[in-house]
């Protein structure tokens, strides 16, 4: 798999739209999270970005064509002069790309308005370079609208969740989050719990009470 961050960085030629969020920046943030989740699913995944260059689309396509990828994905955000425009859509050209597009769309529409999958030529009349110049099956994800406050609020408060949904759609798998996933290896060690320090008779009595409650490994240690 290849995950490509769309556009160059601002203010270079080919940079993305700027609204409530900066598309070029968020393309890179989201794409890297998607790669992270795909690797968790065991998918061999490469990441690519082109930050400057008038031929950035050709550079992106060259990377996509450099291996026999099962799928190449480019991350984008949509924009409109109409501030009310909102929702998510995945764009494709090939029949194989259409299958992947629908799987990702089915995931993203749980968070954003469903604008349906679209063929870049038949539906959008756009002949997109990413889909025109790439050899492997390819899709282009328009995550949501940078020009819509509701869309961007949903996105910025759930970046990793959105990335997880995209990864699940691409891989056709579900990621089960481990509630203890942030526990470090050091936290898996055993630790002694020291309660108090007192005279021998009191300490002995406390030890016996603890043993009677099932705490067999209870010791008296002189201080």
Give the positions of each predicted feature.
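Short beta-strand motif preference
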Residues: 3, 139-141, 193
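Solvent-exposed beta-strand motifs enriched in subsets of small alpha/beta binding domains
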Residues: 179-223
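Acidic/polar N-terminal loop/beta-strand segments that form early-domain functional surfaces
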Residues: 6, 50, 223
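Hydrophobic "anchor" residues on beta-strands that sit immediately upstream
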Residues: 1-2, 70, 138, 219
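Short glycine-rich His-centered loop
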Residues: 1-20
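Active-site-proximal helix/loop segments of hydrolytic enzymes
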Residues: 11, 21-180
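Generic anion/oxyanion-binding catalytic loop in active/binding sites
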Residues: 16, 53, 192-193
């Amino acid at each position: 798999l290849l995950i490509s961050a769309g556009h160059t960085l601002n203010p270079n030629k080919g940079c993305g739209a700027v609204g409530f969020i900066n598309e070029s920046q968020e393309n890179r943030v989201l794409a890297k999270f998607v790669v992270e989740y795909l690797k968790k699913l065991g998918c061999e995944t490469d990441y690519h970005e082109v930050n400057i260059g008038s031929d950035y689309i050709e550079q992106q396509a060259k990377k996509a064509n450099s291996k026999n990828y099962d799928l190449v994905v480019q991350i984008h955000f949509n924009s409109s002069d109409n501030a009310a425009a909102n929702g998510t859509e995945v764009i494709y050209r090939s029949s194989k790309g259409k299958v992947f597009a629908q799987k990702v769309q089915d995931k993203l529409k749980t968070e954003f308005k469903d604008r349906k999958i679209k063929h870049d030529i038949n539906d959008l009349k756009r002949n997109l370079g990413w889909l025109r110049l790439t050899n492997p099956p390819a899709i282009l994800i328009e995550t949501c609208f940078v020009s819509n406050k509701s869309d961007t609020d949903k996105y910025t408060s759930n970046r990793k969740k959105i990335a997880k949904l995209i990864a699940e759609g691409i891989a056709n798998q579900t990621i089960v989050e481990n509630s203890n996933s942030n526990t470090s290896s050091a936290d898996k060690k055993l630790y002694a719990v020291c309660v108090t320090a007192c005279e021998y008779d009191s300490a002995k009595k406390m030890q016996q009470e603890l043993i009677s409650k099932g705490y067999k490994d209870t010791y008296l240690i002189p201080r």
